[in-house]
């Protein structure tokens, strides 16, 4: 009897868990698009309205804005991971063996393109909070796994590199925003130049 009644309960639990994850993913997608369109200052009320639901429902899936930030950061990180794998696979398919310069260039490009593709979302996930710390730590771990074996203390190097790149990209984006509102200010570098310079600087730091 217990086995007979347990199976339907387990089935309902599994369906509910699946529904919850699906709804959570939908809300996260709505939040991403809203932040992309309106910028990082959107509220949980804004997200609820765009989702056609109430704020209390949103809080069932995300306990607070910091958790939303962390989940969105995790989603962005997964996209960066896929881009890195694809770029390295493309290099290998072309007959190249990615060394330190190619790997670091690919990692920086993935980061810069993430910021450039959606400045609002990028600004949202790097706002000071536990969510930011989680995102940057996750990026550091991701980078460390892609570094060549020749790099000493890869975790330490990755943490330092991420801090350097994050600060540099933030300054670059601020310059973009300033120039957009006041064209008389110095024009910012384009994304390709940013990637090239950051790669060069980090490579010099790796081999002083």
Segments (PLM) and residue ranges:
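Hydrophobic alpha-helical connector segments
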Residues: 71, 85-120, 157, 161, ...
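Alpha-helical DNA-contacting segments of helix-turn-helix folds
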Residues: 22, 35, 66-79, 83, ...
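Intrinsically disordered, low-complexity terminal tails and inter-domain linkers enriched
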Residues: 93-98, 177-189
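Basic, helix-initiating cap at the start of DNA-binding domains
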Residues: 1-41, 45-49, 67-70
């Amino acid at each position: 009897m217990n086995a007979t009644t347990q199976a339907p309960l387990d089935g309902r639990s599994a369906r509910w868990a699946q529904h919850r994850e699906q709804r959570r993913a939908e809300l996260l997608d709505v939040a991403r698009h809203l932040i992309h369109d309106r910028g990082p200052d959107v509220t949980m009320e804004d997200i609820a309205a765009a989702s056609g639901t109430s704020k209390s429902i949103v809080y069932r899936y995300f306990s607070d804005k910091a958790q939303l930030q962390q989940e969105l950061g995790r989603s962005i990180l997964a996209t960066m991971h896929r881009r890195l794998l694809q770029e390295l696979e493309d290099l290998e398919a072309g007959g190249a063996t990615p060394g330190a310069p190619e790997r670091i260039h690919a990692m920086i490009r993935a980061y810069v393109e993430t910021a450039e593709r959606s400045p609002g979302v990028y600004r949202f996930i790097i706002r000071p909070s536990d969510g930011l710390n989680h995102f940057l730590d996750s990026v550091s771990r991701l980078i460390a796994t892609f570094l060549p074996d020749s790099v000493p203390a890869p975790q330490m190097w990755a943490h330092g590199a991420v801090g350097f790149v994050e600060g540099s990209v933030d300054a670059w984006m601020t310059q973009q925003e300033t120039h957009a509102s006041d064209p008389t200010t110095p024009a910012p570098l384009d994304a390709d130049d940013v990637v090239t310079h950051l790669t060069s600087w980090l490579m010099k730091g790796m081999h002083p």
